[in-house]
Amino acid sequence: YYYIAALHDLHARGLLERAVRPETLATLKQRLDWRRFVRPDLSLINLPNNYYGVAFSIARFRHLLGWEDASAGDQLLARMIDHYRKYSGEYGFADETEGKGRFDRYSVLLIGEIAHRLLETGMTPSDEVKAWLRKSVDLLLPRFNLHGEGFEYGRSIGTYGDTAFLEVLTAAALLKVMTPVEERMAYAFSSRVTARYMDFWIDPVSGSVDLWGRTLWGQGRRTDAYRGEARILGENFSLARQHIYTNAIWNRLGYRGQTPDAGFERWLDTLPRSTMTWFARGVHDRGLV
């Protein structure tokens, strides 16, 4: 996804042919293909359902690069939306499985990613997508804190548990699904997330994000095995990009150089001390207290 997004960025600026040789571009056209992990019937190949968002993004960028028509992206988007409706319905959260009830960080984050990918590729999020995005915002707001700490449960968290907030909140700010006060507080919290990234997650000696234990690469801010040491370079690129592109959105919205709202700490005291968010109801109810 990141590779093809960069190619699209170059293409949009009229620089692609100058930056990438034709033979390299031909190779990338074959390799950067959503079909490598999606079957012809649009089922994923041994991957959790958040990868539908990745597949849609790649298909949409391939279309904008002139590599394929729009039909695959449209079908993958419809598949994602149908998944929401089928397994969460009115509650608006993504089951990571086909109805087995695994709701974690991705369940809240995915709608933010979908909204961003729609906007990045020239599409308009539907009212339904905006409503689901607002539900994710409602879950995140009571979790705001002074230290920029994000999700503490679910798979593949670590620093990604923090950046999940950045992506959902900036999508919500772009689509105006928050109140002006909520938007200011979202910016204040996002600033704390980025400060935590630099002060806690980045190892000052190596200059690398620190996820891999007491090695050359850090002092032990551990995550799960999914993000093993083989992914050191990729995780640094991925995380840096998340902070850079979400900061660029805040800049576009008028927050460039702005000091976070001084009333943030007082505002935290107005938040509910406990909430109940339903993910799905049925034979087995799923929710988050």
Where are these regions (language model features)?
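Aromatic-lined, polymer-binding surfaces characteristic
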Residues: 1-176
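Extended polysaccharide-engagement surfaces of secreted carbohydrate-active enzymes
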Residues: 146, 166, 170-289
